[in-house]
């Protein structure tokens, strides 16, 4: 069994690395240069970087040139996310040289387009499933978490049947809160698809990472780690050691 892959997150607003609380615009804490942040995680042993253009995700501009610069300076693989919702933005994202892109809102709002790009690009396209549990129902959220995107299980079944190669699963009540991951949600998604699942949101401790790592045999391949690293709850080398024990 492969050890859990850790993807340190670099969220970019106006060229700077930031962290949001529950993905809300305006809730960010700034951590400095995005290039420096990404190179720092590479230096600390990261094999992947999760790079997010929050300006593009919220529809208020783009950091495309900077993202391409970050990808170009890194030797490790990059998963690129934020505002990828049509052929033009997808082509621009892939042109940075990233290993794969995450499609979010477009998978909910434009299912025909999403099915086509899954078919055309295969392993280079992952789909982000941002989940909010309301009265026991698992609802998907789109457009920076402002809109309802339907029932998680229905959409997962559709995307799985279309051959989606990977799902990035976020419990949005947990993201940026250091509140612990939603293990039941991760296991539930992993059990319903043969595609690998990447966990996102809520990681606050090495024990959280060890808990996610117990799900690798069920199909959870990796975990995105953001605020806990920036808040110095643990170092990346400590985290890598914890999931390889």
Swiss-Prot record:
Pfam families: His_biosynth. It catalyses: 1-(5-phospho-beta-D-ribosyl)-5-[(5-phospho-beta-D-ribosylamino)methylideneamino]imidazole-4-carboxamide = 5-[(5-phospho-1-deoxy-D-ribulos-1-ylimino)methylamino]-1-(5-phospho-beta-D-ribosyl)imidazole-4-carboxamide; N-(5-phospho-beta-D-ribosyl)anthranilate = 1-(2-carboxyphenylamino)-1-deoxy-D-ribulose 5-phosphate. Involved in both the histidine and tryptophan biosynthetic pathways. Its EC number is 5.3.1.16, 5.3.1.24. It is found in: Cytoplasm. GO terms for cellular component: cytoplasm. InterPro entries: Aldolase_TIM, His_biosynth, HisA/PriA_Actinobacteria, Isoase_HisA-like, Isoase_HisA-like_bact, RibuloseP-bd_barrel. This is Phosphoribosyl isomerase A. GO terms for molecular function: 1-(5-phosphoribosyl)-5-[(5-phosphoribosylamino)methylideneamino]imidazole-4-carboxamide isomerase activity; phosphoribosylanthranilate isomerase activity. Keywords: Amino-acid biosynthesis, Aromatic amino acid biosynthesis, Cytoplasm, Histidine biosynthesis, Isomerase, Tryptophan biosynthesis. HAMAP family: HisA (MF_01014). The keyword Ion transport does not apply. It comes from Mycobacterium tuberculosis (strain ATCC 25177 / H37Ra). CDD domains: HisA. It is an enzyme of class 5 (isomerase). The active site is at 11 (proton acceptor), 130 (proton donor).
């Amino acid at each position: 069994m492969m050890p859990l892959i850790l993807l340190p997150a670099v969220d970019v607003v106006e060229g700077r690395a930031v962290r949001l609380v529950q993905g809300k615009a305006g809730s960010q804490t700034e951590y400095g240069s995005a290039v420096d942040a990404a190179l720092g995680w590479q230096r600390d042993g990261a094999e992947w970087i999760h790079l997010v253009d929050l300006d593009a995700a919220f529809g208020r501009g783009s950091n495309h040139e900077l993202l391409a610069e970050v990808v170009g300076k890194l030797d490790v693989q990059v998963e690129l996310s934020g505002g990828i919702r049509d052929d033009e933005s997808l082509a621009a994202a892939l042109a940075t040289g990233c290993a794969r892109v995450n499609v979010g809102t477009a998978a909910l709002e434009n299912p025909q387009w999403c099915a086509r790009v899954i078919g055309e690009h295969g392993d280079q396209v992952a789909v982000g499933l941002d989940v909010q549990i309301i009265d026991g129902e698992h609802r998907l959220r789109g457009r920076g978490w402002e809109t309802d995107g339907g029932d998680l299980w229905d959409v997962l079944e559709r995307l799985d049947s279309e051959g989606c190669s990977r799902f990035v699963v976020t419990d949005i009540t947990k993201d940026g809160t250091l509140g612990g991951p939603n293990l039941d949600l991760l296991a539930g998604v992993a059990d319903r698809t043969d595609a690998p699942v990447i966990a996102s949101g809520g990681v606050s401790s090495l024990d959280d990472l060890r808990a996610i790592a117990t799900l690798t045999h069920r199909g959870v391949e990796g975990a995105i780690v953001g605020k806990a690293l920036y808040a110095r709850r643990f170092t990346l080398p400590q985290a890598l050691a914890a999931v390889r024990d």
